[in-house]
Amino acid sequence: MSSVIHAVNLKIGYSPDSILGEIDNLEIEQGEIVSIVGESGIGKTTFLKSIARLVNPISGTLKVFDTEGVSARGVIGYIPQKLGLIKHETVYSNVLEGAICNESILRSISGFHEEKVIDKVKETIELMNLSDKIDEPVKRLSGGQQRRVAIARTIAQGPKLILADEFLSELDDKTVENVWKSMLEYVTSNNITLVIVEHNIERARLAERCFKLEKNEESDYSILSEVKI
């Protein structure tokens, strides 16, 4: 397997004066499913944003698909806590937005393959069990349904790496089971790497490997280490 995320002596935060966490050595391979746990405010979201290059690392090495710049963004799908959906638009329109934000898909549209994009959008909506809501404005959906729209929008981008921040929150146990099953089928069949932030330990156990961010007694910031849960 090839390395997707490679971090060495990495410090994360929003400025050198407010370092939140340190990652001494981390390797995540293609196709792995990994969870990150830790107390609220410990730096889990900041770590995901650093991987996605939405936040620049303070220091150290962070390579995603063997690059340290923003060029990997096109193959990274990010599901944030705040979903950022267009509430007055339909489910279809929101998922379509995810599909066409990928530059390679835009090129395929100009090459008269628009029907492939439409098929991809509909398949992704079906994967998240939203076909009966396809023409509904997002604002009319429940919180759990809106979260499934956000997941579908990310999948429609065709990413090789998915970063999911509490992506199972606001879902009841049965829906969690169904959404996780659909996500697992998708990432395993497409050899996609999935990194999830979770506060729920039972849900974190669904991953193959788990890492914990926790305060280091010798410093003011947290340290990432692999744990068994």
What are these regions (language model features)?
Residues 60-74:
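Conserved ABC transporter NBD signature motif
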Residues 108-133:
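Conserved ABC ATPase "signature" region
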Residues 162-165:
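Catalytic Walker B motif of ABC-type/P-loop ATPase nucleotide-binding domains
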